[in-house]
């Protein structure tokens, strides 16, 4: 009876077969280059001329007195072109001036620059290659070189 059941299982495809996969181990050989084949790279440091692209002989200063918020992009473009920008916001409404300062301070931060207040409503934006010291800031505010209230 066991014979009949095994024949039926084999016809239906249910017969258990133990299959063994035979694997052949392949051997890999690493190709090693001789040290004689490697050529050293020789650089001539005397002929290489590296120039900083951000070096400029003259620094330009842009002085703006915006009358609306739309001028914020022009201020940021000047800062992006590595110019020092003086911004006078005394003629703007308080809310518009705050929005303008938020926008240009974010751009200044993204470009690696610095925003400092000189006087009430007057700000200086300096690019990353320019440093404004506190002595200069104190001197500008004490001498009132930029008297915008006239």
Curated annotation (Swiss-Prot):
Keyword Cell division: yes
Subcellular location: Cytoplasm
A Gene Ontology BP annotation from the UniProt entry: FtsZ-dependent cytokinesis
Swiss-Prot/TrEMBL keywords: Cell cycle, Cell division, Cytoplasm, Septation
Pfam family, one: SepF
One annotated Gene Ontology cellular component of this protein: cytoplasm
Signal peptide positions (record): none
InterPro entries documented for this protein: Cell_div_SepF, Cell_div_SepF/SepF-rel, SepF-like_sf
HAMAP family noted in UniProt: SepF
Similarity field: Belongs to the SepF family.
Known partners and oligomeric status: Homodimer. Interacts with FtsZ.
General function of this protein: Cell division protein that is part of the divisome complex and is recruited early to the Z-ring. Probably stimulates Z-ring formation, perhaps through the cross-linking of FtsZ protofilaments. Its function overlaps with FtsA.
Name of this chain's protein: Cell division protein SepF
Organism: Clostridium beijerinckii (strain ATCC 51743 / NCIMB 8052) (Clostridium acetobutylicum)
Gene behind this protein: sepF
